[in-house]
């Protein structure tokens, strides 16, 4: 049974996920600026994946009658990024933060479509994060 509380919770989950993806896209811009040149394609692919998920979330939000948030001009980076190592650390943090968002998303939505979307987002972020942690020599 879908109630108004359920709709508000799903709406909140969608809007939070959009914000998380907007922050990830911004942070990947910082990663790109400091990354090892050998990782340029990987960074571009990950950025594109976050854009695609954000765009899908915006469409889902709009279809639900919500007004999706626009991206902020800037987002706070959790630590200074000054070289390729700190850029990779930021990328790992981006994916960890995104995974946390999708974990909460799955708990807050009630439709199979949205749960599947959240599980896919969680899985994708976990895989990307494991790749970055592996590149850093830390255990996934």
Per-segment meaning from a language model:
Residues 1-140:
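All-alpha RGS (Regulator of G-protein Signaling) helical domain and cognate RGS-like helical scaffolds
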């Amino acid at each position: 049974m879908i109630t108004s509380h359920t709709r508000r919770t799903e709406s909140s989950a969608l809007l939070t996920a959009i914000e998380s993806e907007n922050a990830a896209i911004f942070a990947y811009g910082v990663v790109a600026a400091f990354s090892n040149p050998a990782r340029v394609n990987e960074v571009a692919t990950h950025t594109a994946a976050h854009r695609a998920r954000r765009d899908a979330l915006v469409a889902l939000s709009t279809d639900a009658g919500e007004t999706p948030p626009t991206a902020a001009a800037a987002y706070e980076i959790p630590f200074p990024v000054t070289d390729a190592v700190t850029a990779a650390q930021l990328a790992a943090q981006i994916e960890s933060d995104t995974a946390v968002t999708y974990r909460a998303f799955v708990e807050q939505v009630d439709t199979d479509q949205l749960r599947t979307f959240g599980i896919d987002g969680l899985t994708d972020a976990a895989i990307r994060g494991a790749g970055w942690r592996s590149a850093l020599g830390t255990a996934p």
